[in-house]
Regions:
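Juxtamembrane helix-boundary/capping and inter-helix hinge elements in multi-pass membrane proteins
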Residues: 78-82, 158-163, 173-176, 227-231
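Short hydrophobic, aromatic-rich alpha-helical segments embedded in or entering the lipid bilayer
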Residues: 36, 213-224, 300-304, 316
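Glycine/proline-centered hinge or cleavage motifs at structural transition points of membrane proteins
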Residues: 171-172, 185
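Glycine-rich helix-loop "coupling/hinge" segments at transmembrane-helix boundaries
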Residues: 107, 203-229
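Membrane-water interface segments at the C-terminal ends of transmembrane alpha-helices
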Residues: 2-33, 44-158, 186-206, 234-253, ...
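Feature of multi-pass inner-membrane transport and sensor proteins
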Residues: 161-162, 177, 214-218, 247-281, ...
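Peri-membrane helix termini and adjoining interfacial loops of integral membrane proteins
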Residues: 27-38, 110-123, 212-218, 258-267
Length: 336
């Protein structure tokens, strides 16, 4: 018994050390003497990094919270055409990495992409730079990461107390009022958990922000290390990123408090039946999100793949597939 206890403690300690060691390393960078490069970053780039990162987090956070919660409520609480298969289809964007979705939308909606070409030639709409501003990158992150909030909110809605929902219905509350005043407050802990994961993913992303030429802490860390060859400044910037991550975790725990994610009441709620036009409007909304976040990008990837494979297929693609498969398998085994 003691031997098993010590073995389990050893592996837990090893895991904790593996997580804590990189944090300790980047934190210890502040003990090093200051450099002119850090002063340059702090005076010229740091305010821009903080502003752009904050705008990105606020935009993505608000977007995934609203979209993920609304989608979860619709598939759980409302009966509409296509509900049964759309409920699981909304998880499929998990299978497309964020940078891949960004690459697809840049290829389609960039100035030379066929979407802008069609808009200019047939509708006379002038060209625009999809990389300018914040809206395009925020929408990309929302389409990629909304499943985190959707997954958590959906599970919460399925386990909410039937008595409270039914009481609201009996008192004559309309579905939208039940949603805002009963269902959403009860699901707040789950929504906060999904939001936390989303913000952490957004904060750590490098591929999407690089494709959009958007300045965040991750691009600054890479620039400090790769362009300026300064590991010290890169570590100091990374420590600020870790500090923001700790703040997000603390904020999520405070927002959740001691609230429960689910109720022990497992009675099934009776879904609202959306009749006629309303049901089809809901269907096209949910289906549209599925198309934008998964089906259309996947179709575009397949089209590009077939074009490439038909002209330059070679054995190196088998190496790419095998390497990806091995890494996926090993990561899955180690994680589980």
């Amino acid at each position: 018994m003691k031997e098993a206890f010590f073995k389990s403690n050893f592996w837990i300690g090893l895991l904790a050390f593996s997580v804590a060691f990189p944090i300790f390393v980047v934190g210890s960078s502040w003990l090093l003497p200051g450099s002119e490069l850090w002063l340059h970053f702090a005076q010229t780039l740091l305010p821009e990094l903080i502003t752009s990162t904050l705008i990105l987090l606020l935009g993505v956070g608000a977007g995934v919270s609203i979209l993920g919660t609304v989608l979860a409520y619709l598939v759980v609480m409302v009966e509409f055409p296509g509900r049964s298969w759309l409920e699981w289809a909304l998880f499929l964007p998990f299978g497309i990495p964020a940078y891949v979705l960004a690459f697809v939308y840049l290829g389609v909606f960039d100035y030379s992409g066929y979407a802008q070409v069609w808009l200019r030639e047939y509708l006379g709409i002038p060209g625009f730079d999809i990389r300018s501003g914040h809206w395009a990158i925020i929408l990309t992150f929302i389409l990629v990461f909304y499943p985190y909030v959707y997954m958590m909110a959906r599970a919460s809605f399925k386990r909410q107390k039937v008595q409270m929902i039914e009481a609201g219905k009996m008192l004559g509350a309309k579905p939208i009022r039940v949603f805002w005043q009963i269902s959403v407050p009860l699901a707040r802990p789950a929504i906060a958990a999904g939001l936390l994961v989303t913000l952490m993913e957004t904060l750590a992303d490098f591929g999407v922000v690089s494709l959009f030429n958007y300045s965040t802490f991750t691009t600054a860390i890479y620039s400090a290390w790769g362009d300026f060859r300064s590991i010290e400044v890169a570590a100091q910037l990374a420590s600020l990123l870790v500090l923001v991550s700790f703040f997000l975790i603390y904020f999520e725990r405070k927002a959740r408090g001691k609230a429960k994610y689910y109720s022990s009441d497992v009675s099934h709620l009776k879904a609202y039946y959306a009749k006629g036009v309303v049901g089809w409007i809901i269907f096209f909304f949910v289906f549209g999100i599925f198309m934008l976040s998964f089906a259309m990008p996947l179709l575009q990837i397949l089209i590009w793949s077939l074009e490439v494979f038909s002209t330059e297929w070679s054995k190196r693609y088998f190496n790419y597939f095998s390497s990806s498969g091995i890494l996926t398998f090993l990561a899955t085994v180690l994680t589980v």
